[in-house]
Amino acid sequence: MYFHITYSDLDINETHDDDLKDFLIIPEEDIFGQFVTHILDPNENDLYEIEPDKICKNPFSSSIYTNNITIKNKYSLLDANIYEILLSKGISKYIDGLLVWAINFNLLWLLELIYNYKPPINLKDREIYLNSNCDDINLIKFIVTRNDYFQINLESLLEYVDNKEIIIYLMDFIDTDKIVKYVIGNCSSEFFIDCIKGNTILTQEHIKLAVQNRKIPVLEHLINLGIEYDLNEIINDIKDFDILKYMLEIGNSLNEDNVNIIIFNIHTTQLIEYLMNLGYTINSKLVISMFSHMLIVSENTDIVEFLKSINAKDSDLTVDFIEYLLEDNFEKAKQIMEYFPGANTVIDCNLFLKYAIISQDIPNIEYSINKGADLKKYYKNILLTNNVTILDLCLNHCEINDVNNFILKIIENDCIETLKYLVDNNYNIDLLDMFQIMVKKNYYNPIRKYICEQIKNNNLLIPNLVEIIMNLFFDDGDVNWILKYNFEYQYKDNLDEIIMTIIIGDCDGAKNMIMNYNYTSDLKVLYAFILKEFPEECSSEKMDTIKFLLDFNADNNEYVQSAFLLSVFYTPLLKYFVEDKQIDLTVNGQNIVEYLISDGDHEIFRYLYYNGFDVKNNGFEIINAHNSNNECAITKLIESIKNNTYQ
């Protein structure tokens, strides 16, 4: 029994492969796996029971296709009959997937049907698949009351439930303390207060959970119940300002270690100012060390005044702290230099310049230059600003002699304004070298367009341009971005001119050259025609030219055989060989399949199979070919064409 899956609003003949017109089919033993992997929708998909014609088991994947089907039955995915048929036949492969699918769509009747047949399942550690419908009380009750079969870890269900009715229901089946702890962390405070009614034993552990989850009403309720706790044992869990305020307001106090822990955990200037107002001593070194990576500074906090208030000393000021200020506020950094003279040993004008360039702060770039900053240290940073004003300001003070050392970075960061500035100011920019970089690195950005325009406007001749274009073309690279500039081409020989004419898209011109220059039997010419994607209106002209070359070389067996191998890249040509020329695939198909193994084109393999090529009958072992050290015939042929070593 085989199946084909369709969309309900499509005719079955609209669901075949667009090119081959074949159908993806699923054997009965694999059908349950499709429900989850393809996320079938009972309202959008239908299931057809079909009789296949030729069955093609793809050697590169688990997919199975057929060239034609006969419809036997059509089933809705909500039709219990099809599941009854399959389960009664003992089909159980991928049953877990069907279960998950039924749960997702809340199909209790299907779950009941599966439960009645009890095929072997394994949902252990897979409770996550229940998350989509875990708030349905009927589904939960169904699973819990039949958990002798489903074997689901009920405690894990808590991770996906926030329904009060369900959680209270689960309290009869799960350890109450685990539920209470879950509720503290995941549900409202009011819900928690409802849950603990009864004989629930509450401890400091529950207070700690309330602190960790920042639940002040829960914390207040537990403390009002008289639950004992030791502040020193929960201090590391206090990471919320409001929680701390509550704990201090009810009479708790902090020792020196606790203050440092709290500052580290909550790390805001608001907290520090609050603690100072309560009379606590602040560790200025600790606070300053936190500025660069974690301290959250309130909007209304004056950094200089804040440092004064915590009694910061010159020696406390670190490079990280100063860099933080430079990144955030240059003016504050200047004020600190004035108020803390010792900061000048940490801050130098080069550090100022670095961050002024990064933030493109022109006044402070000028300030740094006037202070004697070394511009040479920051050539790269200056060039990557892509800011003409900054470039003009800096490069007027210090000219860059080795600008080409930074070209790659300029290209990578798409700094087109920088490049224009350098060209306009007569820096020695090697545009031809930049063009080679664009080709080699396959960069696509506005710089590429600018470089090509400059080369064109300056009438520069690109060395080996024809070779560059042909190499890109035969490696399936984009050449159109080069062709559109109509650069001057220098051909080494007539063959180069023919290939370039094909690449440009002049089919008639290429055909005339082939005849005039006597290249009718050249494989590189044929390969170029096969690879070139002509406009749709010229597609018949392309095929006619290829047929002309084949007819001209009809007595040249080696040429015809090579053309057949190359047809793997042009399906109309392959069909021409198979359907019009009726080439013997039992003799010739193996080389193509060898190439397809590495290329992964499943469609062409199926086409060959439907037209007579049989892997088994040809004694062709897919695994052996895949692991073989011997290069396949097509790969060898292509390499010989690219390297001009073909005959």
Swiss-Prot record:
Q: Signal peptide span per the entry?
A: none
- Ranges occupied by ANK repeats: 123-154, 202-231, 233-256, 258-284, 289-319, 348-377, 401-431, 529-558, 588-617
- Tagged with keyword Glycosyltransferase: no
For this UniProt record, the keywords arranged alphabetically read as follows: ANK repeat, Repeat
Asked if the record carries the keyword Repeat, the reply is yes
The protein in question is named Putative ankyrin repeat protein L764
